[in-house]
Structures are given as structure tokens and as C-alpha cells.
Amino acid sequence: MTGAASALRYWELRQEVTANNLANASTDGFKAERVFARLLNGAPVIGTHTDRREGAVHQTGQPLDIALGGDGFLVVNTPAGERYTRGGALQIDTEGFLADRDGNRVLGAKGAIQVGAGTLVVDRTGNAAVDGKTVDRLRIESTAGGATLDHAGATAFVPGATRTLVADDKRDVQQGHLEDSNADSLGGLVDMISIQRAYAAVEKTISVLDHVREVATSQLGKGAS
């Protein structure tokens, strides 16, 4: 039963992850998750990892939209601490600070970036100017040093246990653009059908094994009496 139970957990996780990827197929900056299964010291290990491939970039013409090239991430300040995101649909909060879609303030080298009612211009290296005056430089950090990331929301990440992110020396910022989700909606729908079939097959196998065990137990009981 151990193998069948592990298979059931695997397909359950595949279903959950695929559903989440599909739900975020149109979320800018979203990075799809993938499920893996392997043996470690003879025992099955099932988990997920983030697909960090870049999504397509499209032009919006909106000055508060930011797309990042390479593997850099914007740094935002949340109630739970700093988080990393490629979700570039930014806004100005009620106090005039640059913030992400969830209201978390985007950080620059000096801290939160105050824009107020001015016009924001961000160059390709992340320098932020308001009404022609440079006020800060976006903090953009990278996983190039081998850091891993764990999901902390639709487009937010926290560093994994291995190491922290490093400053992105190859920063490429495009104002007026957004990066699309890298989730494949069509492929996800096809996967979901296959997953549901596989899940049903494993459930049937477990049901058959349960029945065989019950019959065997019953026969042993009769033999003992």
C-alpha cells in the first residue's frame, strides 16, 4: 500500500499545483510550479520547485508598469518582512509611495520610494526619477548566486534555505511593460485531464488492494477458527 499511497499523494499534489498554475495563467510576473518525485535513501520524496523561466514581455504604455529582464526580482516590504516579486503592475499608495498591486511598498537603495503626484521615469538600470530629478534606484536582486525561492503568494517569493539573493548586476528594466505569466494554460488543461485519469486509476488500485486485504484477513480468521 505504501507505493499506491505515495502515488495518490503525488497525483493530488499535481492536481493542486496545476490548478494553481491555471488560475494564475494571466497573472503578470507569475512563475509556475512543477511537481517532482524521486527516491531518497530508498524512500519516495515528493515536492515542488519553481519554474523561473521568463514569461513573454508586452508593452502597456503605463508608466507604473515595470518588467524585468533576466532573473532579477523587485524587493517589496510587507508586514511579514521583505519579499521578492516580478509582478510589475505597480501603483502609488495613499501616502505617495511606490507600491505593488497588494499595497506593499517597493524598495530602492534608500528605502521606500516616494513619488507623490509627480511623474515617474525609470531607466533601464532601475534609476527612478520624479519630475526629472533622480530620487532613488530600484533594489533588484537576483538568484544568479544559486539562491532558491519559495512561493509566498501569487507573485511573491521568500529565499529558500540555501542562500540569500544578491544584487542584480545585469539589471534590465523596461518601464511601460509587463512580464506575462510563464504558466501554459493549454498545456495545463491537457495535464489536468491526464492527472484526473491517473488519480482515478490509483484510487481504484487502492480500493482493489483494500478488498484483497479484507478477503485475506477474513480467510485467515476462518482458518484460525
Where are the predicted features?
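Amphipathic alpha-helical polymerization modules
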Residues: M1-S225
